[in-house]
Structure formats: structure tokens, C-alpha cells
Curated annotation (Swiss-Prot):
Organism: Homo sapiens
Tissue-level expression: Expressed in dermal papilla cells with aggregative behavior.
Pfam families given in the database record: TMA7 (PF09072)
Modification ADP-ribosylserine, positions: S61
Start-end of Basic and acidic residues biased regions: 27-45
Region annotation (Disordered) ranges: 1-64
Coiled coil: 21-50
Family per record: Belongs to the TMA7 family.
Lineage of producing organism: Eukaryota, Metazoa, Chordata, Craniata, Vertebrata
UniProt-recorded name of the protein: Translation machinery-associated protein 7
Alphabetically ordered keywords of this record: ADP-ribosylation, Coiled coil
Keyword match Hydrolase: no
Amino acid sequence: MSGREGGKKKPLKQPKKQAKEMDEEDKAFKQKQKEEQKKLEELKAKAAGKGPLATGGIKKSGKK
């Protein structure tokens, strides 16, 4: 019976310790992801803005 109790206690303790360790790592990792996402969003916005302008220019030149 003590084996079962020990089995229950160990999993409960492990996630707490891992959560604390992962918190620091997760914070740094999340910050990196946020920075990368911001860069990607900026690039996407620039690319999206340039895309329609380029196609619009082609269409206009085609009409002329």
C-alpha cells in the first residue's frame, strides 16, 4: 500500500518542480517567440503592402 501512496506523491511533486524550472525557461523562450512573431508580422505587413502595389502596377501598365 505504501508503494501506491509513494507513486501518487512523486508525480504530484515532480510537475511542481518541473513547472518552476520550466517557468524560467518558458519565459525566455516565450520572449524569443514574441520577438520573432513581431518581426514576422512586420515583414508580412510590408510584404502584403508591397504585393498589391506591385500587382496594381502591372495591371495599370497592362491597361495602358
